[in-house]
Amino acid sequence: MSTGATSGVLVAVCTTHGVRDDGGRAGRTGIDKRPRTGPVAIADDVLDGDLVGDELRHGGRDQALYAHARDEARRWAIELGREVPPGWFGESLAVDGLAVTDAVIGQRWRIGGDRLGAAVLEVTLPRTPCTTFSRWVEEPHWVTRFTERADVGAYLRVVQPGTVKAGDVVEVVSTPEHGVTVRQLFTRTDPAARSRPGPGPQGRGRGRAGPRPGRARNARRHRPGETSTIPLPDRHPTDRMTS
C-alpha cells in the first residue's frame, strides 16, 4: 500500500459463492465470496451476483461494496501461516497498490477503462469485525486481533453505476480536505472523532480509542435504502474532482 498513491489495480471482483448457515441472529451469511471472471455490473446498491445474508447489519446504500487491500491480506497470510485468497475477508473488491484502510472518508474512486461505463465509488465507513467473521475465519480471538491490527478495509457507496473487472485501474478522482481516514474513524484517533460522542447511542467513551459507533446505531445505518447518518465533514468538495 502507498498512502500517497493515486491509482491501484483491481485484483479481483468477488461475489457470494453461496449463502451459508451461520450461528448468528440472521442464521445465514453471504461472507463466502469468490473471484468472478469477466465484467461484473455494479448497480445503485449492489454488485451483480452478490448476496447479503444479514440485511439488517449489512448492505444498503453506504455499504454497497466492501474493499480490502491485498497488501493487508499478505500481512495476515504471513501471520496466520495460511493462504488468504481474494474474497477471504468477505470483500467485494480486492485492491492492490492503493490505500484502502488509510483512504480518506468521502474519497472517490473510478474503476474501469471506459469512462462512460466506469463505476464511481465513494469511501464511506470502516468494517467492524463481527462474530460471523470470526466463525468464518476460525482463528482464535479473531475479532480482537483484527480490531487491534485495524487494517479493516472500507465500505463503499455507488456514485455512478458501471461495469468492472479484474485488472481494471482503480483511480482516485477526488479526496475531501477534512483528511479523516477510514482507520482514524475506526480507531477514533482523529481530532473530529475525539470531539464527538463515543460508541453507543448514549455517547459512551467520549474521546476514547475504539471501534466505531455501537450496535444500535449500526443497525439503523445498515438498513437498505436509508441514507447515511455519518457525522462527518463534507465528503466530496467538487473543486477537488479531476477529469
Where does each model-flagged region fall?
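Electropositive, beta-rich accessory/interaction domains or terminal extensions
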Residues: 1-135, 141, 174-243
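A short, contiguous structural element within a folded domain that forms the immediate neighborhood
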Residues: 144-145
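Short amphipathic alpha-helical interaction segments
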Residues: 159-162, 177
